[in-house]
A protein has these predicted regions:
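Short hydrophobic beta-strand that contains or immediately precedes a catalytic carboxylate
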Residues: 55-57
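Long, contiguous domain-sized segments
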Residues: 1-48, 52, 66-69, 94-315
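Short beta-strand scaffold segments in enzyme catalytic cores
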Residues: 83-87
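Covalent nucleotidyltransferase core used to form phosphodiester bonds in nucleic acids
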Residues: 69-77
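Short acidic, Gly/Ser-rich segments with clustered Asp/Glu that frequently serve as metal-coordination loops
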Residues: 60-65
Length: 315
């Protein structure tokens, strides 16, 4: 009988875990076709060379202040929040920031839609209204604004013919070179018979492509981006996905391309607290985007002083 082992999570605790598990990954409730690419489930080593230009996409969001709107006992909860999205383009040995954009939103629940005047020339909030009133519903709407911004940027760069690697699950359903990069695992899409292939991957190898998704059909695969001795079995393994609209042969080409090149972008523990899955271009971009949001305390003071000075127009 194998001896039990203990691992210390490589990620810093404030980011949760790279594998949200309770004894093992839960199985996805999606209907998965594991034989999209081949019936022989074994590790695949891409036979590629060269370094194609690639754009790495990510976004951030932040609640700047909580708020209420209304009169007497009839008040609607809301928030002021900032979102940002951008890209790092890596071409050969050079990298550059591309199109980093900041948006600021006021989100109010209960159908309330107060029109907010600009608090300053640099801090202007556009309005969103939702029927719900729970704090998580307000936050979800802010996150949707961030996702929309990321999606628009991903679509634009992919339409220009660039290889785009977007942090997180894929939402765009177009036949473009857009790859969703999922760095943490809450569930597995592999059966007990196929999961050992993913866990046994060497750096720069991938599983065969499998298909899933009724509403948003996708091709997906697992790949190991770095060695991870003495860590959880799923550490340093990422899942990637593309829309089925690209077609199987193009998906195979993208899977080989991404699998071959991702290891050179794996971060190191001394530099990033979510290493190695938090890729260096994405981690660099995150830091840039957070800086663009501005100091939270200063932004909150502008909001408070603006509201006190009558920064709200008629509802």
């Amino acid at each position: 009988m194998a001896e039990d082992q203990m691992w210390v999570e490589a990620w810093s605790p404030e980011y949760g875990s790279s594998s949200e598990v309770d004894g093992g990954l839960a199985s996805s409730d999606e209907e998965v076709d594991p034989f999209v690419e081949t019936t022989e489930w074994r590790a695949i080593v891409p036979g590629l060379s060269g370094q194609p230009a690639a754009a790495f996409i990510d976004g951030v969001d932040r609640v700047d202040a909580r708020a209420f709107f209304g009169g007497g006992a009839a008040t609607s909860p809301g928030l002021f929040g900032s979102v940002a999205a951008g890209a790092v383009v890596v071409d050969g040995g050079r990298a550059r920031f591309e199109t980093c954009e900041v948006q600021r939103w006021s989100v109010f629940g209960g159908g309330a839609d107060p029109r907010v005047r600009p608090f300053s020339s640099a801090i202007t909030y556009r309005g969103r209204s939702i029927p719900g009133t729970r704090p998580e519903e307000l936050r979800n709407e802010l996150q949707k604004a961030r996702s929309d911004l990321e999606e628009d940027l991903s679509r634009r760069l992919a339409r220009e013919g660039m290889l785009v690697i977007a942090d997180g699950p894929l939402r765009v359903r177009e036949p473009v070179n857009l790859v969703g990069y999922i760095k943490s695992h809450q569930k597995t899409y592999l059966s007990p018979g196929h999961a050992p292939v993913a866990l046994g991957l060497a750096c720069g190898e991938r599983t065969p492509i499998f298909g899933f998704g009724r509403i948003r059909p996708r091709y997906s695969w697992y790949t190991r981006i770095a060695a991870a001795p003495n860590q959880h079995p799923w550490a340093a393994i990422a899942r990637c996905e593309v829309s089925t609209t690209v077609g199987l042969q193009r998906a195979i080409g993208l899977a080989d391309l991404v699998t071959h090149h991702l290891p050179r972008f794996a971060s190191k523990a001394f530099w990033d607290t979510r290493a190695p899955q938090n890729l260096v271009p994405i981690a660099t971009l995150e830091r840039k985007l957070w800086s663009l949001l501005g100091d939270r305390d200063l932004v909150m003071r502008r909001i408070r002083s603006g509201v006190r000075a009558g920064g709200r127009a008629d509802a």
